[in-house]
């Protein structure tokens, strides 16, 4: 977990988990579920393998996390589609990228229903309950798979009220969609986004 991004005090609230510098000690049988950024970590390991083999180009996908590696034979950018969060059988937009890691988080594929309400599989660490957010989809593009995987989840939980800090972050590009179909994005990627459904629109 890239604790430098948020600070360990925001992530660790269990007395059985001790953090000192870069060392983490788990006590009394405590385990950590790496589901939040396991795919991103795996992508980074695949990238190391591709580097060692001097691969020219590859697209590796672990579901919601994808590695765009190298340069395509025709020298054009990669084109990435984002699932429509209101209709999973379709896409809502696409964008082009020269390469890197892409991760998307949302509550539209894995959720449960209780008390007449849909609850996301993504939990808010400050409450211990499924997160309640006005965002329905968050995509992050960057160079590190573990960071894009982790950050897409964090930004999704934080909602649109915390978007500005991420939209202005020069190390990543962000595309976020709220429950009304409004698309927020980093300035650097807006010209490379193509919206494919008229129920979505830029802020």
What are these regions (language model features)?
Residues 19-86:
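RNase III-family endoribonuclease catalytic core
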Residues 64, 119-175:
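Proteins synthesized as precursors that undergo proteolytic processing into mature forms
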Residues 179-203:
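Low-complexity, Gly/Ser/Thr/Pro-rich intrinsically disordered linker/tail segments
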Residues 14, 55, 75-77, 90-92, ...:
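Extracytoplasmic
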Residues 86, 107-121, 126:
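Pocket-lining segment of extracytoplasmic ligand-binding domains
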Residues 1-7, 11-12:
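Single conserved hydrophobic/aromatic residue that forms the stacking wall/gate
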Residues 71-108:
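Phosphate/pyrophosphate-binding betaalpha-module
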